[in-house]
Amino acid sequence: MPQSQQSHRKDEHVSLAEKYFHGEQANAFDQVRIRHDALPETAVADVDLATTVGQWHWDSPLYIEAMTGGSQRTGEINARLGRIAAACGLPIATGSQSVAIKDPQVAPTFATMRDHNPNGLIFGNLGAGHPLSAAQTAIAMLQADALELHLNVVQEIVMPEGDRDFHWLTNISDLVQALTVPVIVKEVGFGISRPTMQQLYAAGVRYLDLGGHGGTNFVDIENRRRANRDMAYLHDFGLTTVESLLGVQNRPDDLTVLAAGGVRQPLDILKALMLGADAVGMAGTVLHALLHHTDDEVIAMLTDWQSQLKRLFALVGVTRVDQFKSSRIQDKILLSPELVNYKQSIKD
C-alpha cells in the first residue's frame, strides 16, 4: 500500500530533524550562569531526584519529549523509545497522533510505544484544534495517562500544506473539562509567553510544556519542504526555553510547568530547574542518540545523565527538587544582560 502524504511527512520530519541537529550549538541556556559557592554543605548520597509533578510522583524530574509516529520507520522508533523509557523509568510523550486519526491503519505505529512500555507514564499528543472524539481516540490508542495538545502556529504557517485557522482556545477549554486524563498544553519549539500562560490558565489548563526555541526547529524543517524555501527569515522567531521560564515565574501554585527545547546535557536540566521548571524534557538529543546508537547505549546515556544530575544537585547545595524555589538557590542565578532586559520587560 502506498505511503500516505502525512506518513511520508513524518519520515521527512525525522530525517530533517537529524539533518539540522547540532547538539553542542550555543543556545539561551548559555546565557544563564550559576554562581559557584565553594561550601555547598551537601553530599551526593543525600540527593533524592524523586519529585511530585502535578498529580504524579516521578523518580526524577526528567521525561522524553514528543517526537514521531505515523509510518513504518517512525513506528520502529516509537517501539525503541518505549523500551528505552521503560528501562530508564522516564515518562514519555508520543509524536502527534493526528495522522492516525485520519488513517487508523497507522495507529499501531503509536500503540507500539505502550506495547513496549506497559507500565510506564505515556502522554498522547494531538493538535489543539481536534474535537473531543479525536482526543478520546488518541488516549485510547495508547492507554495514555495524559494528552498533550500542541500549539504549533509557526510550524503550520511555514508548512506548505499547513492549517491556516488558529482559533483554539475555546476548544482547549472544552477538552480540559471533558477529558478524564490531564491535558498538557505544549509548544513545539517557539515558547510560551506570560500572556499565553494566563489565557490557558483561565481556560482551565493546569499543565504547560513550554517547548521553547533552541532545539529542534520546525521553521528549518518545514521551510526545507517548501518549493522555494522562502521563509527562512522565521528561523529565529519565538521565545527560547529560558525566556519562557522567566515569563512564567510567579505563576499560580497549581500550574505545573514542564520545560523542553534545546536541552543538550545535564547542566541545561539543572538550569531549567533553577529557573522554575517542575520537570525537563528532551527530544532532539534522544532522537540523535537513538539513530546512532543501540537501545542499550541510549539507556546507558540517560541513566548516566540521571547520575550526573544528582552530582550537580549537590554542587549547588540542593538535595531535593523543591529546594530550587528557595531564595538561597535563586540568588545563585546569573542572567546575561539580554535576559535581564527581557525579564524586566515582562508584565503581569
From Swiss-Prot:
A single BP term in Gene Ontology: isoprenoid biosynthetic process
GO molecular function, one term: magnesium ion binding
Top-rank taxon, per record: Bacteria
Coiled-coil boundaries: none
Binding residues for substrate: R9, K10, Q155
Pfam family membership, one: FMN_dh
Keywords associated with the record: Cytoplasm, Flavoprotein, FMN, Isomerase, Isoprene biosynthesis, Magnesium, Metal-binding, NADP
Root EC class: isomerase
Reactions catalysed, as given in the entry: isopentenyl diphosphate = dimethylallyl diphosphate
Residues engaged in binding Mg(2+): E156
Named cofactor requirement(s): FMN; NADPH; Mg(2+)
GO cellular component assignments: cytoplasm
EC id: 5.3.3.2
Residues that hold FMN according to the record: A66, M67, T68, S96, N125, K186, T216, G262, V263, R264, A283, G284
Family: Belongs to the IPP isomerase type 2 family.
Quaternary state and interactors: Homooctamer. Dimer of tetramers.
Known function: Involved in the biosynthesis of isoprenoids. Catalyzes the 1,3-allylic rearrangement of the homoallylic substrate isopentenyl (IPP) to its allylic isomer, dimethylallyl diphosphate (DMAPP).
PANTHER family: ISOPENTENYL-DIPHOSPHATE DELTA-ISOMERASE
Protein name per UniProt: Isopentenyl-diphosphate delta-isomerase
Organism encoding this protein: Lactiplantibacillus plantarum (strain ATCC BAA-793 / NCIMB 8826 / WCFS1)
